[in-house]
């Protein structure tokens, strides 16, 4: 007599991460903004680093994994969309949230970013709770 096939195991849900395990990279050419975001996110318990250009972000992403990247759209040199595409090649698995001061004027840029896989878009000026809410929506965590 043949054996009964084993039932497939139910897929395991990923354990929620602790805030202290979530790595965040903030990329913006406005140094005051990146420093303020780093200070605020670190105070919330997230491991946070900054980069002030797309090139610097790519270098950091090749050296370390980031769970989430907050990326400014309008930067000199490599802009946010170019950086996003290259980040996808250099560091797949990082969720990207675009930050833009363009508001509604460049709807096409926002639509292109979303079509490429950007998880969310946040308009400047923003409140820190918009940033922390984006993190919670993208990466569920325990605390």
PLM features: residue spans?
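Receiver (REC) domain active-site loop signature in two-component systems and cognate sites
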Residues: 75
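Hydrophobic/aromatic residues positioned on beta-strands within the core alpha/beta folds
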Residues: 99-101
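Acidic catalytic/metal-coordinating carboxylates
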Residues: 52-56, 79-83
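Alpha4 helix (beta4-alpha4-beta5 surface) of REC/receiver domains from two-component response regulators
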Residues: 82, 103-122, 133
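Conserved phosphotransfer cores of two-component systems
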Residues: 62-64, 87-94, 116
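Non-catalytic signal-transmission and effector/linker regions of two-component phosphorelay proteins
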Residues: 1-23, 129-143
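Active-site beta3 strand of CheY-like receiver
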Residues: 65-70
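Two-component/phosphorelay signaling modules centered on CheY-like receiver
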Residues: 31-49, 116
């Amino acid at each position: 007599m043949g054996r009964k096939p084993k039932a497939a195991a139910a897929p395991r849900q990923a354990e929620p991460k602790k805030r202290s395990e979530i790595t965040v990279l903030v990329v913006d050419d406005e140094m005051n903004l990146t420093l303020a975001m780093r200070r605020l996110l670190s105070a919330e318990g997230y491991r946070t680093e900054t980069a002030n250009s797309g090139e610097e972000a790519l270098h950091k992403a090749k050296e370390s994994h980031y769970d989430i990247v907050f990326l400014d759209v309008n930067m000199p040199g490599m802009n946010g969309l170019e950086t996003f595409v290259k980040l996808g090649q250099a560091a797949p698995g990082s969720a990207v949230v675009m930050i833009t001061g363009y508001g509604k004027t460049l709807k096409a840029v926002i639509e292109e970013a979303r079509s490429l896989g950007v998880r969310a878009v946040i308009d400047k000026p923003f409140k820190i709770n918009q940033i922390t809410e984006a993190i919670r929506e993208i990466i569920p965590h325990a605390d």
